[in-house]
Structure formats: C-alpha cells, structure tokens
Amino acid sequence: MKYQKLENQEANWKWIYLIRKHREGENITRYEERSLQEAKAQELLESQNYPEKIEEWIKNHLSPALPIKLDQAIRARRKRFFNGEKQHTKKKSIDLEYAVWLRLSKYSRKMKMTLSETITYMIDERESKAQFENQMAAMKTSLKNLLK
C-alpha cells in the first residue's frame, strides 16, 4: 500500500461522505422503510466523534450499493491528503481560458510532455531568450564603445 491508513481520520472522512450522501437524499442504509432509514442516519449523525461507532455502523447498516463508491472516495481522499503534505506533490490549480488550454494541450502532446513539464519548458525557454537578449545588448554596447 502506497499510503498509510489512518483509522480515525478515515472514519471521519467516511462519516462526512455518508452524511453528505444522506443530505443529498440518497439512501445510505440497507433498509427500504423510510422511518428506519432516518433513524439509522440519525444514529450515524450522532456518532460523528466516535470512529469505532462509525465503522460499526458501516458494517451493520451500509447500503449494498455504497461500499465500492465509499472505498474509492476514501482512497482518493487519502491520496490527496498525503500528497498535500509535501510541497513537490501538492497539486495546484490555475484558471485558463479554454482556447489557451487547448493550445497548451496540443503543444504538450506534440512535445510528448505533461502540461506541467510544458509550462516549465516554456518558462525556461523564455528566461534563456531574455538572458541571450541581454548578452546581445551588452555586446552591441561594447562594440559601439569600441568603435568610437
């Protein structure tokens, strides 16, 4: 396993996920009767700060349609949590206009690079071009002074 499991943290993530699903109107329990669904959801709601109770509730009352979705959500959350700890793995987002993103995407495919690598490459190229222009300007000035 790439990422360490944190039992208490993951129980809290599961609680958040299930309560959000419940508030969106989805049945998170294995029961068909509406009053029983509400009672079990309320029981889960009250067990927020008790990881053992959350895990027990999931084992006993979770809808058969949810375990895979729940596991996927927790796995993704765990990955984001651990990647967010280190600066070099932490993901950042930027807003791009669609046309800009499209051009960048095409250029990335052409260069066989990721978007991040392409942006880094373009910045490096621009910096080296600026450095070259400064050197050329300095040489021109030196030549003019020499020819006077």
From Swiss-Prot:
<dbReference type="GO" id="GO:0043565">
    <property type="term" value="F:sequence-specific DNA binding"/>
</dbReference>
<dbReference type="Pfam" id="PF17414">
    <property type="entry name" value="MatP_C"/>
</dbReference>
<keyword id="KW-0131">Cell cycle</keyword>
<dbReference type="InterPro" id="IPR035087">
    <property type="entry name" value="MatP_N"/>
</dbReference>
<keyword id="KW-0132">Cell division</keyword>
<keyword id="KW-0963">Cytoplasm</keyword>
<keyword id="KW-0238">DNA-binding</keyword>
<dbReference type="InterPro" id="IPR013321">
    <property type="entry name" value="Arc_rbn_hlx_hlx"/>
</dbReference>
<comment type="subunit">
    <text>Homodimer.</text>
</comment>
<dbReference type="GO" id="GO:0005737">
    <property type="term" value="C:cytoplasm"/>
</dbReference>
<comment type="function">
    <text>Required for spatial organization of the terminus region of the chromosome (Ter macrodomain) during the cell cycle. Prevents early segregation of duplicated Ter macrodomains during cell division. Binds specifically to matS, which is a 13 bp signature motif repeated within the Ter macrodomain.</text>
</comment>
<dbReference type="InterPro" id="IPR009390">
    <property type="entry name" value="MatP"/>
</dbReference>
<dbReference type="Pfam" id="PF06303">
    <property type="entry name" value="MatP"/>
</dbReference>
<dbReference type="InterPro" id="IPR035375">
    <property type="entry name" value="MatP_C"/>
</dbReference>
<dbReference type="GO" id="GO:0051301">
    <property type="term" value="P:cell division"/>
</dbReference>
<dbReference type="InterPro" id="IPR038339">
    <property type="entry name" value="MatP_N_sf"/>
</dbReference>
<protein>
    <recommendedName>
        <fullName>Macrodomain Ter protein</fullName>
    </recommendedName>
</protein>
<comment type="similarity">
    <text>Belongs to the MatP family.</text>
</comment>
<dbReference type="GO" id="GO:0006355">
    <property type="term" value="P:regulation of DNA-templated transcription"/>
</dbReference>
